[in-house]
Amino acid sequence: MALLDFILNLAALLLWLNWRLLALAPRESGPSGISLAGTIKSTAASRSPRWPYLSGLVGLLLVRSLAYHTIGSNLAERMTLPFGIVSISFNPRILKQMFLFSGLSFGLFLGAFYLWLLLFSIVNTRVTEPNACLRLLRLHLGWWERRPVWLKLLLPGVLGALAWLIAASLLEALALFPAQSSNTARGLRACLVGLYTYLCWVPPLASVLVLYMVNSYVYLGESAFWGFVQVTGRNLIEQFGLAKLRLRRLDFAPLLLLALVWFLQWRGHLGWFFGGARLLVEGWNRLR
């Protein structure tokens, strides 16, 4: 069920991006060639109706709620939604819980996607001549792309904390999450979720670093994607001050950054040596 939910979230995301892109593409003053398919013309975009994509998105979320209700009831399998630091279990036999699960699942998926875009925007904030991939990224961020870096860095933590405060109230009302003993505990949990939200940057960071290493030693062409990977990887290394960590043709900087990224998301420990995520989980478990 988790794989099915991921595939449907991906389909819903594509519908959302097409709906957004038809409104944003005419504003792009640069050359054409920035779309999900690779090219899109402003004149064509302005004439294309947007409502089918939004209607398809809403319909998909509603239909999959009914599908989860039917399939989950027959399999007697509970649906689990990873809410960052904690996982919430939903009963598929209760239809209203499946509607809530479907909406929250896509909301978290969409939020993580935009936080990935925000990360790449921060890393490449000094790039003055962006290629097609970076232009499209900046186009989707819209107003936030023009905000200062310090505000972009604060945004994931603030949004994660606020999202938990809102979701926790709803989950407690539906008895899907234990009621908190005090507002202080609720606020501390929100802060921990806010901090844990930054760990959603681990997958894109690790992916870019791995692809950067591959592209550094194997020629993979001159496509906009590989250009974006190369620029992003190089900017990451420079911003951490590791640009000179080389031995002849061997670049150790990506490996060092990968080790750091792995440590941040590690939930384990060796003696008194705790991974970054483990510290947040320990703090969460101590709250009542």
Regions flagged by a language model, labelled:
Residues 1-288:
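Selective transmembrane helix interface/packing segments
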